[in-house]
Amino acid sequence: HTNIGPISAQPMAIVDSLDRAILTVLRDSGRAPFVDIAKQVGVTERTVRTRMRRMEEAGVIRGYTIREAGIGLTALVRLKVGPGAEIGTLAGEFAGWEGIECVYEISGDADLVAVVHVDDTVALRVLLEKMWHAAPPGEISTTQTELVLEQY
């Protein structure tokens, strides 16, 4: 356990391909029953229970939020809209997209912030490009993306 300033570095749990398959099902299906997860990944229900208990104890699964397993990332995408842009229309469109949990209209330098969950930085880049291309020219003036490092 090494302390680096106010952040405590913890060793990352070892997650194999079966664990990743289970995590993928959980990410897509929330709290799917063990039997359904077992069918989808091709193992017994008991194996799924054992693996999930181990991942819970290791902190990979916490409150049924997947964290620090090398699967997925969460980002906050702040958008500043151009003059005359319909903030509600833009927010409503983005809010319905896969990978976007929600979109808030906010005060401050930005007008909107989208809470985004994607597999990796490549998927994040694709989503950002999709946002820019979906908006009519001039509707988005800038974006600023912040990666979430930890959820408490």
Locate the predicted segments by residue.
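A compositional/biophysical signature of low hydrophobicity enriched in polar/charged and small residues
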Residues: 1-152
